[in-house]
Curated annotation (Swiss-Prot):
It comes from the Bacteria. It is found in: Cytoplasm. One of its GO terms (cellular component) is 6-phosphofructokinase complex. This is ATP-dependent 6-phosphofructokinase. Catalyzes the phosphorylation of D-fructose 6-phosphate to fructose 1,6-bisphosphate by ATP, the first committing step of glycolysis. Its EC number is 2.7.1.11.
Length: 327
């Protein structure tokens, strides 16, 4: 039976991570188990930055953005000798289970710890990109969405005043969920996402068609890394003869107090992770990730959640249909 549970946050931070940490800590203590915080992700696990936590360690953090445990990217964790040192550190503290809050890379690290060290590991999806399979939504997605929509609303004010085209670059890496949701909620006229092939000439045709119908201004949302939006802005202005301005929202999307849904989702996921760990049999090493599907908590093997095929199946085509209908 699991006696000591560790918790860490890894990769890019997301609003709601603190709520998840709180959920893990309070639920572990409720089950009369001990809980340890691991600072600065896998880097901290490697450096043995591990400290026992109590219920007061997580007081007044549910409303705070970021992560009190800190986070770091630690590519050296791909090396087996570094993972061996991390496992040794866990064993030295008597930690036999670990909750990892993060994205795909964090999940992959957790799976290796389970395989190589016999550590029970549960992953919680903590990323604003919403690009983790096995869950409808990840912790932080809805807070980031609110941030992006508020920015779009402000840009629309100035775009309409100057009859201008605005291009808004949104985070997401290779996933267009945040861009797509923001475009729908912000009433944007055009959307460019990784899941749909991008044709600049086709975009110009659509913009000109809107102008011909009397459209005075427009907002274009685009997922990061698709193209250089400064160059795209110049191209659109040249082809349409309309003033065009790019805006990169950047890391502001990761910050801020989490919205209510993210706080609830993170709390539920944290509690569910502990429930899975407490119920697990030591003979069968647990390596799974938690998600919400159709409103209910679910779990699946980490290997399934980080597979390319499952990530492709996650794309919200119904959202794209709505967007195309409304635009």
């Amino acid at each position: 039976m699991v006696k000591r549970i560790g918790v860490l946050t890894s990769g890019g931070d997301a609003p709601g991570m603190n709520a998840a940490i709180r959920g893990v800590v309070r639920s572990t203590l409720f089950k009369n188990k001990e809980v340890f915080g691991i600072y600065d992700g896998y880097q901290g696990l490697y450096d043995n930055q591990i400290q026992q936590l109590n219920r007061y360690s997580v007081s007044d953090i549910i409303n705070r953005g970021g992560t009190i445990l800190g986070s770091a990217r630690f590519p050296e964790f791909t090396q087996k000798e570094n993972r061996a040192r991390a496992i040794k550190n866990l064993n030295s503290h008597g930690i036999d289970a670990l909750v990892v809050i993060g994205g795909d890379g964090s999940y992959a690290g957790a799976e290796l710890l389970a395989k190589e060290g016999g550590i029970h590991c549960v992953g919680l999806p903590g990323t604003i990109d919403n690009d983790v399979a096995g869950t409808d939504y990840s912790i932080g997605f809805f807070t980031a969405l609110q941030t992006v929509v508020e920015a779009i609303d402000r840009l629309r004010d100035t775009s309409s005043s100057h009859q201008r085209i605005s291009i808004v670059e949104v985070m997401g890496r290779h996933c267009g969920d945040l861009t797509l949701a923001a475009a729908i909620a912000g009433g944007c006229e055009f959307i460019v996402i990784p899941e749909v092939p991008f044709d600049r000439k086709e975009l110009i045709t659509e913009i000109k068609a809107g102008i011909a119908k009397g459209k005075k201004h427009a907002i274009i949302t685009i997922t990061e890394r698709i193209c250089d939006i400064n160059e795209l802005s110049q191209y659109i202005e040249k082809e349409t003869k309309r003033e065009t301005r790019p805006t990169v929202l950047g890391h502001i999307q990761r910050g801020g107090a989490p919205v209510a849904y993210d706080r609830i989702l993170a709390s539920r996921m944290g509690a569910y992770a502990v429930e899975l760990l407490v119920q697990t049999d030591h003979k069968a090493i647990l390596s799974c990730c938690v998600g919400v599907q159709n409103g209910k908590m679910r779990h699946a093997p980490i290997s399934e959640c980080i597979s390319i095929d499952n990530k492709r199946q996650k794309f919200k085509e119904d959202w794209l249909d709505v967007a195309n209908t409304l635009f």
